[in-house]
């Protein structure tokens, strides 16, 4: 029986391809071919980087939530770089640190542009399918996600676009190549709308504020070109936006609550103690719940938020007053301390108001560096910063959990702030890990972690180039600043100002300049004036902390490392001698590590790093390595070990992998009938190199070595 199959070729009638140039390279968008069931989808091709961007939204709002449920996922597939995952299952697992940080970078500029009263689940997914090291997958994903949302039927006030800005040899470079990034003094990820800056994420090598603003302006110009491209696509194939059911309180009910309880809330808020404020709000909310039994828990949370927000914002904009009584540019009380923990390598505690962070520094060998099994530019990290935020730091009674995205993001910000001032590996061949334990949190814990890291590193004796401090700046707006709306920035925001304000602008740096920036906003963007003012306020606050708080406590790194820290030494050996130091199957290097209680790391270029708790052990390992890589010299005396006995003499190992023969006639200064009468296998003996033949065989003499040693002792005795 013959079967007939209809031959049908899918031609994808909705397929469209759009092309432009982005920072000098081709940027291609393909739609209508993949992921037909998503609300919006686009394949982005930038150079040879390919990122598939999708956005989906639930049909109904999620019940019982008082927030907009947005999730942003940046998925790194190692096949994109032609690699197989190193896990046991050879499969990608949970998102790595780099993927989480990329997700946060995309989340922050798109989130403020969604309707705040929408409760439908929205999921944005960016899948890296091909990785070109010269074309950022992160920037491609950000622009692709913006396009996918803008052309979808999901309500959104975008688009935005992003660009990467570098500073190479003093020149601003847009979307620099991998080689340019390695030599850049600036790593700035910028997102913006047509008129405003929406997100800033930066690491910098002590770049001044003026140069930073030039980089921001240059990046914004390129972003405007990308926005024009995105808008042209949306105009052609964009879908009409869906309607949604907004979550809102009854206006009459809210007016009644304001009339009856706003003055009580003002009295409760007027304190610099977070616990007192929270406790004072409880009876007020209980009273509101009793007056309006129809309100749900989510409704009450929203009312509490609105009441506190109204008080905080009104006080700031109308009276220039802060809830804790500080001036607009006044920093909370500060304290710093080092050397708190006796057995750790370094420790520092930084306190700012009710925010307190204890940072511990640990030094390790190069083998302790973190291997990065992801698509980042860095194969491993020698400086690691971990940030822990336990529940007790905010007075919550629950069990701790593993680090989430917030902890990873805050840890990376403090890590990025310190990297520019770390010594080069050749100067200080240690792996460095700092752990910041948040003991109490009332805002700006990430910046307290930067300050705590500086204290801990200097306490550990790490020769950092300059101390680093961090501080944040907040913002309150009333209307659009571009069109006459009022706005005010304030220095060193605490938790309640962060929660109810419009911006958390965090800046870390030294006296010379900026080393890290992270900007979070809740409005649709910032003007240049706001960004410039925030940078200047953070500069002044940073200098105050460095000069008045950190310097009096510890002005420079300690001259010596902790006695509990491993002692690290480095040396160079010829590349062709690496195999001799390692030995067959690693035998030689393993024996040295065991005999001298040390760690030995050898790099491909011949750099050798030796670490040991006891300095003498490390020096003995260095001496042994030198004997391995150096050619034996005639007349040199070595302390060797007898390895074999023959009728005609004994073989002696003078260095791992190097043996020579002591003829029976050279064993002693008298006639020897039997070799075993003088030495046994395993005996340590002194020998002198007397000859090396053309085949590299080494002839040794115990008799000559003993005579030379006796002569030196006699000469020393006469002196």
Regions found by a protein language model. Give the residues of each.
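Extended amphipathic alpha-helical scaffolds
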Residues: 2-58, 62, 243-377, 566-580, ...
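Single-stranded RNA-binding regions, centering on S1/OB-family and related RNA-binding modules
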Residues: 564-568, 575-719
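Conserved phosphate/anionic-ligand binding catalytic regions in large, soluble enzymes, centered on
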Residues: 40-43, 135-153, 338-361, 442-462, ...
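Conserved helix-loop functional segments at active or binding sites
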Residues: 108-116, 151, 340, 365-366, ...
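Flexible, glycine/charged-enriched surface loops at secondary-structure junctions
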Residues: 116-122, 157-159, 226-244, 275-276, ...
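Long, basic N-terminal domains or extensions that often function
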Residues: 2-245
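Mobile "lid/hinge" segments at catalytic clefts and subdomain interfaces of large enzymes
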Residues: 153-268, 457-559
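Glycine-rich, flexible beta-strand/loop modules in the N-terminal catalytic cores of phosphate-handling
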Residues: 38-122, 128-135, 194, 201, ...
């Amino acid at each position: 029986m013959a079967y007939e199959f209809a031959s049908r070729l899918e031609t994808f009638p909705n397929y469209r391809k759009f092309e432009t140039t982005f920072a000098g390279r081709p940027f291609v968008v393909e739609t209508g071919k993949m992921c037909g069931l998503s609300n919006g989808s686009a394949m982005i091709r930038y150079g040879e980087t390919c990122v598939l961007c999708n956005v989906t939204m639930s049909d109904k709002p999620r019940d019982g939530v008082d927030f907009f449920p947005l999730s942003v996922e940046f998925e790194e597939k190692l096949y994109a770089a032609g690699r197989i995952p190193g896990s046991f299952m050879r499969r990608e697992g949970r998102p790595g640190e780099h993927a989480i940080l990329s997700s946060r970078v995309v989340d922050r500029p798109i989130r403020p542009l969604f309707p705040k009263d929408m409760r439908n689940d929205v999921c944005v997914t960016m899948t890296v399918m091909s990785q070109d090291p010269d074309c950022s997958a992160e920037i491609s994903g950000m622009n692709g996600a913006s396009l996918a949302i803008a052309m979808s039927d999901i309500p959104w006030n975008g688009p935005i676009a992003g660009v990467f800005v570098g500073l190479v040899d003093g020149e601003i470079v847009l979307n620099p190549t991998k080689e340019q990034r390695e030599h850049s003094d600036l790593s700035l990820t910028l997102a913006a709308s047509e008129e405003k800056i929406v997100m800033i994420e930066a690491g910098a090598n002590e770049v001044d504020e003026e140069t930073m603003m030039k980089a921001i302006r240059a990046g914004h110009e390129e972003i405007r070109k990308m926005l024009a491209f995105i808008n042209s696509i949306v105009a052609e194939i964009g879908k009409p936006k869906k309607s949604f059911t907004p979550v809102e309180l009854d206006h009459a009910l809210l007016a009644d609550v304001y009339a009856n309880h706003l003055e009580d809330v003002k009295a409760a808020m007027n304190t610099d103690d977070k616990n007192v404020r929270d406790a004072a709000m409880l009876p007020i909310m209980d009273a509101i719940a009793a007056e309006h039994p129809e309100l749900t828990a989510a409704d009450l949370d929203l009312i509490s938020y609105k009441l506190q927000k109204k008080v905080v914002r009104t006080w700031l904009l109308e009276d220039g007053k802060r809830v804790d009584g500080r001036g607009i540019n006044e920093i909370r009380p500060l304290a710093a301390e080092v050397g708190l923990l006796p057995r750790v390598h370094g420790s520092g505690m930084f306190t700012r108001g009710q925010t307190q962070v204890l940072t511990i520094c640990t030094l390790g060998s190069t083998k302790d560096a973190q291997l990065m099994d992801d698509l980042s530019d860095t194969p491993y990290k020698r400086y690691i910063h971990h940030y822990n935020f336990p529940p007790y730091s905010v007075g919550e009674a629950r069990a701790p959990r593993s680090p989430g995205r917030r902890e990873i993001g805050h840890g990376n910000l403090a890590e990025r702030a310190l990297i520019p001032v770390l010594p080069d590996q050749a100067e200080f061949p240690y792996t460095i890990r700092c752990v910041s334990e948040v003991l109490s949190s009332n805002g700006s814990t990430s910046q307290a972690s930067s300050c705590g890291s500086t204290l801990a590193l200097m306490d550990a004796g790490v020769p950092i180039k300059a101390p680093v401090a961090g501080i944040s700046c907040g913002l309150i707006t009333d209307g659009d600043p571009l069109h006459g709306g009022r706005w005010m920035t304030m220095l060193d925001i605490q938790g309640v100002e962060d929660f109810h304000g419009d911006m958390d602008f965090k800046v870390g740096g030294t006296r010379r300049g900026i080393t890290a920036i992270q900007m979070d906003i809740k409005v649709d963007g910032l003007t240049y004036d706001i960004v410039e003012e925030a940078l200047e306020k953070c500069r002044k606050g940073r200098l105050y902390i460095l000069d008045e708080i950190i310097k009096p406590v510890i002005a420079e790194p300690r001259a010596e490392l902790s006695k509990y820290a491993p002692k690290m030494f480095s040396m160079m050996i010829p590349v062709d001698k690496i195999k001799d130091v390692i030995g067959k199957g690693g035998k030689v290097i393993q024996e040295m590590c065991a005999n001298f209680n040390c760690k030995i790391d050898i790099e491909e270029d011949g750099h050798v790093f030796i670490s040991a708790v006891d300095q003498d052990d490390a020096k003995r390992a260095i001496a042994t390595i030198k004997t391995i890589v150096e050619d034996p010299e005639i007349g040199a005396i070595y302390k060797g070990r007898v390895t074999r006995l023959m009728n005609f003499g004994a073989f002696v190992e003078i260095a791992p992998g190097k043996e020579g023969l002591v003829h029976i006639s050279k064993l002693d200064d008298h006639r020897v009938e039997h070799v075993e009468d003088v030495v046994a296998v395993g005996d340590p003996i002194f020998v002198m190199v007397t000859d090396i033949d053309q085949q590299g065989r080494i002839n040794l003499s115990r008799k000559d070595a003993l005579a030379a040693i006796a002569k030196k002792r006699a000469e020393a005795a006469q002196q």
